[in-house]
Amino acid sequence: MGVISGYAGGITINPTYERVSAGDTGHAEVVKVIYDSALLSYEDLLTVFFAMHDATTLNKQGNDVGTQYRSIILYTSDAQKATAEAFIVKLDNDVATGKIVTELKPLKEFYDAEDYHQDYYENNKSVPYCEIVINPKLAALKEKFNSLVG
């Protein structure tokens, strides 16, 4: 199990952080999740995904604004697509959730982000962004999903 930071969902071949940040590649900043489906279900991943970010505001996460920050699910199978569609319908039917704006599309190509983006939190725990943004998210993740993240 693990994650790889990267870019996907756009049109530019071999995008860089600078190009993606400029908003002209069509790519979103994404994370490839590598997991064992015998230990963690795709629905579990969707539960965590929707609980840990704002899927109701278009092109914005926290103070980060732009299409590269859009909520997006890039599926790799028809089964993943169907599961994600059903999950989104269930959330849309929950009045308290708000309208889900998450983009759902097939993964065509995933591009690894630059090395300095990989394991960013582990390598930069004392950076203000990690202390102010990531630490509270990790605490919430552990509190809400301790059985999944251990």
Question: What do the PLM-derived regions correspond to, one by one?
Answer:
Residues 1-150:
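Flexible coil/turn and secondary-structure edge motifs
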